[in-house]
From Swiss-Prot:
Residues 96-122 are annotated as: Disordered. Belongs to the universal ribosomal protein uS13 family. Part of the 30S ribosomal subunit. Forms a loose heterodimer with protein S19. Forms two bridges to the 50S subunit in the 70S ribosome. GO terms for molecular function: rRNA binding; structural constituent of ribosome; tRNA binding. InterPro entries: Rbsml_uS13_C (IPR027437), Ribosomal_uS13 (IPR001892), Ribosomal_uS13-like_H2TH (IPR010979), Ribosomal_uS13_bac-type (IPR019980), Ribosomal_uS13_CS (IPR018269). This is Small ribosomal subunit protein uS13. Keywords: Ribonucleoprotein, Ribosomal protein, RNA-binding, rRNA-binding, tRNA-binding. Gene3D superfamilies: 1.10.8.50, 30s ribosomal protein s13, domain 2 (4.10.910.10). Located at the top of the head of the 30S subunit, it contacts several helices of the 16S rRNA. In the 70S ribosome it contacts the 23S rRNA (bridge B1a) and protein L5 of the 50S subunit (bridge B1b), connecting the 2 subunits; these bridges are implicated in subunit movement. Contacts the tRNAs in the A and P-sites. One of its GO terms (cellular component) is cytosol. GO terms for biological process: translation. It comes from Geotalea daltonii (strain DSM 22248 / JCM 15807 / FRC-32).
């Protein structure tokens, strides 16, 4: 089982799919990584040689921000917005949608379960 960026890749999947188990790597990024490393995308992850794993690992370390570093950057960006007090930061702080979605109805994912108000009728 190959271990890249602190993640154990699943054994029986194609390496193109297995790389997407790493936070910050999707399908297109995994295809680019494999093309630069010169590894066939259809190879199963348990059939990779040590040199291929080393090439992939080196390519990811050099070109892609993944896992902890990426999570830290995202949280620092959100914290920066909240410290600035800009509109997006206020929306993050209040736990409301940030990208202009409606909130009179819907937005339940961001707002949480509905809290009924006593005495409010149509």
């Amino acid at each position: 089982m190959a271990r890249i960026a602190g993640i154990d890749l699943p054994r029986n999947k194609r390496i193109e799919i297995a790389l997407t188990y790493i936070y910050g790597i999707g399908r297109s990024t995994s295809q680019k990584i494999l093309a630069e490393a010169g590894v066939d995308a259809n190879t199963r992850s348990d059939n990779l040689t040590e040199s291929e794993v080393a090439k992939i690992r080196e390519n990811i370390d050099k070109n892609v921000k993944v896992e902890g570093d990426l999570r830290r950057d995202i949280s620092m960006n959100i914290k920066r917005l909240m410290d600035l007090g800009c509109y997006r930061g206020l929306r993050h702080r209040k736990g409301l949608p940030v990208h202009g979605q409606r909130t009179k109805t819907n937005a339940r994912t961001r707002k949480g379960p509905a809290r009924t108000v006593a005495g409010k009728k149509k």
